Amino acid sequence: MNKKSIRDVDLKGKRVFCRVDFNVPMKEGKITDETRIRAALPTIQYLVEQGAKVILASHLGRPKGQVVEEMRLTPVAARLGELLGKDVKKADEAFGPAVQEMVAAMNEGDVLVLENVRFYAGEEKNDAELAKEFAALADIFVNDAFGAAHRAHASTAGIADYLPAVSGLLMEKELDVLGKALSNPDRPFTAIIGGAKVKDKIGVIRHLLDKVDNLIIGGGLAYTFVKALGHEIGLSLCEDDKIELAKEFMQLAKEKGVNFYMPVDVVITEEFSETATTKIVNIDSIPSNWEGVDIGPKTREIYADVIKNSKLVVWNGPMGVFEMTPFAEGTKAVGQALADAEGTYSVIGGGDSAAAVEKFGMADKMSHISTGGGASLEFMEGKELPGVVCLNDK
């Protein structure tokens, strides 16, 4: 990575405005999944050890520029204190005189959590005045929120106009892993692209066709490709306006010598429920009033074999409706193949794929699970991320 990180700057006694991603799921004021808080710990601990005054900023939910009581970061600050084993202060605002007083009272190694930055309308507009207010609190800006790096907001990008800007350890790791995958991958390099819609994955498929040896597709988006081959797909998801594009992608794969894998059999159902009746049929035999909801057992074996023989696998998007038990086997099988593959480096591209490996208890068997769904997708499309571009070069 050619951007400066916290390892490249002197932090002792400095006020550090550190943008983290504490956007954790909450239920009735309780945190239901603290993965994102834990992911930020190495950076926070490093800043503390180096004697910085650590000012943490994050969003939580979508309050749309106003104060929403249940989206305050108070429970997050409390949990962070427990995880760090130290006293963590919490401000009621994200800038202003009261916050400046709290910062002025900080000693080296102290940690202060600011209030939800999206309580201010200027945050998502990347308002320069708000960015200046944030910058006034600190000497250095650290961006460790890879999950929000694709957003040009006041606390992720705008603030970098007024302070030296470096990455945290989590951001640095994300950029190193994803950057190497795209620029200098170990081969064979396989991408697994799933999820519901072709339109969400157009950019990533197009960009990866130039880089991968194998492209595997699954999930709802696969049926548009199946239809493009002239097969009937019953009531399965299909984007008719993307059929020509699907044909173009399959042709491009052929021209570039990329092995293009799509389902040969699928799990079909007549109803979406936990107790649904399912059948397994070949891909060209989906009846008119049935819907494809998962990849079938033959497909799972083929995909597992490709995975096993790959050196690098990037996975973005599930193979079926994994949230429901009868339609989860395909996604589980891909996760299992990655967990079992020896000598294969696995990169899970955030979002639903990350949720799936967590759900099936396979997370600790993956080499790298990205903390950013949208951010990792845009990175894999070859786009520049505003929260990265704004950091100082080495």
UniProtKB/Swiss-Prot annotation:
Any one Gene Ontology MF annotation carried by this entry is: phosphoglycerate kinase activity
Annotated ATP binding lies at K201, G292, E323, G350, G351, D352, S353
Gene Ontology biological process terms in this record: gluconeogenesis; glycolytic process
Q: Which residues bind substrate?
A: D21, F22, N23, R36, H59, L60, G61, R62, R118, R151
Record PTM Phosphoserine, positions in chain: S183
> What subcellular locations does the record give?
Cytoplasm
Q: Which domain of life is it from?
A: Bacteria
Enzyme Commission number: 2.7.2.3
The alphabetical list of record keywords is: ATP-binding, Cytoplasm, Glycolysis, Kinase, Nucleotide-binding, Phosphoprotein, Transferase
Q: Which reaction does it catalyse?
A: (2R)-3-phosphoglycerate + ATP = (2R)-3-phospho-glyceroyl phosphate + ADP
What PROSITE patterns does the entry give?
PGLYCERATE_KINASE
SS bond partners = none
Q: In which pathway does it act?
A: Carbohydrate degradation; glycolysis; pyruvate from D-glyceraldehyde 3-phosphate: step 2/5
Gene Ontology cellular component? cytosol
- List every position bearing Phosphothreonine: T299
Q: What is its main location?
A: cytoplasm
Whom does it interact with, and what assembly results? Answer: Monomer.
Matching entries from HAMAP family are given as: Phosphoglyc_kinase
Q: What family does this chain come from, according to its entry?
A: Belongs to the phosphoglycerate kinase family.
For this entry, the protein name equals Phosphoglycerate kinase
Organism, as annotated: Bacillus cereus (strain ATCC 10987 / NRS 248)
